[in-house]
Amino acid sequence: MGKTPNKAGLTRLELRIMQVIWKSGRCTVSAVQEELEPPLAYTTVQTMLNILERKGKLKRELRGRAYIYSATITEAKALGQGLRDLIDRMFGGSSEELVMSLLRNGQIDAKKLAELTDRFNQKARKP
């Protein structure tokens, strides 16, 4: 029976682990463990990789005595899913409310918003 990918966003730790795998392509538990800062126990990394595999974010192949993990989702797709999840949970599904919140909180100003609008319009005009 195939695995149904979980569309939910990644936790902070899951994202850190996925970033290691996106950067390296294919990794063993030990290789992921070596790249993580601060360091985590081997069993913690192994558990997290297994969770990501069950969620459908990773696949694994047995090579010798070790599993090799690789991503089944691109970084861009994961970012999109995480952003969609954030917008749904925090802004009632409204991307407009996200932008208004950024403006209200001073995290983006009118000038930057105008620049982003120009970039959006340029992209929309391209076939």
Question: What are these regions, as identified by a protein language model?
Answer:
Residues 49-50:
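Short, hydrophobic-biased segments on the C-terminal half of alpha helices
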Residues 56:
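Glycine-centered, phosphate/nucleic-acid-interacting loop/turn motifs that mediate DNA/RNA or nucleotide
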Residues 10-13, 26, 92:
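Short helix-coil-helix linker/hinge
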Residues 15-20, 31:
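Pre-recognition alpha-helix immediately N-terminal to the DNA-recognition helix
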Residues 79-126:
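Amphipathic alpha-helical dimerization/coiled-coil segments
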Residues 1-16, 126:
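Short alpha-helical segments that sit at the start of domains
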Residues 10-13, 63-82:
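Short, cationic-aromatic polyanion-contact patches
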Residues 26-36:
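Short acidic, hydrophobic short linear motifs in intrinsically disordered regions
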